[in-house]
Design a protein with these regions (language model features):
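Extreme N-terminal tail/first-helix region
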Residues: 1-16, 72
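Short beta-strand segments
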Residues: 14-48, 54, 62-66, 77
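A short beta-turn/loop motif at secondary-structure boundaries
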Residues: 25-27, 68-72, 110-111
Length: 128
């Protein structure tokens, strides 16, 4: 199985990813999140005003890990870079993630502006 095939298998429900970004002071910030793949990119969905989005706008480098939660474990560790972000379709993408991971509709909180962040993997390490 090719590395990208394993990324596609793991980067989606029910597997939760852990995204590492760099804070303004250089310290790491790690956040668990839901994710999906599209055209050899990894997409995450977040809200305007979050620490992770501010970090990504300042420094687009990321590290991401996802594991299958099995023993022996299958996992990927990915280094990549943000190649774009958009508000267009972000609410729909959020709905898709909620349905896939939780089986419910996204809460659509008042004033919450969603953003799709597109990550291009530069290095994929398959573990397991």
């Amino acid at each position: 199985m090719k590395d990208w095939d394993i990324v596609e298998r793991l980067c989606g429900a029910p597997h939760v990813g852990h995204l590492a970004t760099v804070r303004g002071d250089g310290s790491p910030h790690v956040a668990p999140l839901w994710l999906s793949t599209h055209d050899e990119e990894i997409w995450i969905n977040t809200s305007e005003g979050t620490a992770k989005l501010a970090n990504l706008r300042r420094d687009p480098r990321v590290a991401l890990s996802v594991d299958a939660g099995t023993s022996p474990s299958l996992a990927v560790a990915i280094r990549g870079v943000v190649v774009g972000e958009t508000h267009e379709g972000a609410d729909d993408h959020d709905d898709e993630l909620w349905q896939a991971y939780d089986g419910t509709d996204a809460p659509h909180l008042e004033g919450d502006v969603r953003v799709i962040v597109r990550i291009k993997p530069e290095r994929i390490i398959v573990l397991g």
